[in-house]
Amino acid sequence: MQISSNISGCPLLTFDTLPSTNTYLKEHADELPDRTVVTADLQSCGKGRIGNTWLATRDMLPVSMLIKAPDNAHDLTVICAVAVCRAIERLSGIKAGIKWTNDIICSERKVCGILCESTLKSSCNGAIYNNVICGMGLNVNQDADFFEKSGLVNAASLYTLTGNKYDKMLAAEYIVDELTRLIDEDFSTVINEYSQRCVTLGKTVKLVQNNTETTAFAKAIAPDGCLICENEDGEFTVNSGLV
């Protein structure tokens, strides 16, 4: 383990290999300061939403941040998505969009997934609060063969999209820099940028909720980040599920 003083002003822990950067922060949250960042050169058991797993490769960047008792816990997936988009554009110049809720899309390919997990904690005075771990997995330097052999036909890396290799720690620095800036920004500004970047809007989409599939038109993003849809029965709001 290497301990660095900070990354964009946040405490940083770097590892050669970890099962999961999110899991490490959950297990060690009590002994780590707020906004501690963890990265690993290789994440062997990474995970995404609804239990999806990540394929292990040193060409992917896993980066997670611990946020202790945030006031805006429900906003953090939206904030992370915008932060990653900004970081990708700073690093590579590629325009980045968001597939609701948490997939980052470049050139119609997924390049990053986001998983924000909360854990309930008790303070010394008995108060209950949430810690949130914001985890991001960015495809940085994988080649086309990796995605072909893995059967990931809708995924790409910054390398496959540009032909350039990138410094993973520089990518992490940009992500953390944008994330720390956006956490403290007015959320209405963030949600406006999220809406502008959302590639789901204006399309007919399939919604999968509780093992039930429906079709609807993705109309707008609500002020809280939910997806506003419309079908023959009228307008409705989706707060979770697959799109």
Regions found by a protein language model. Give the residues of each.
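N-terminal lobe of the biotin/lipoate ligase/transferase fold
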Residues: 1-90, 94, 112, 123, ...
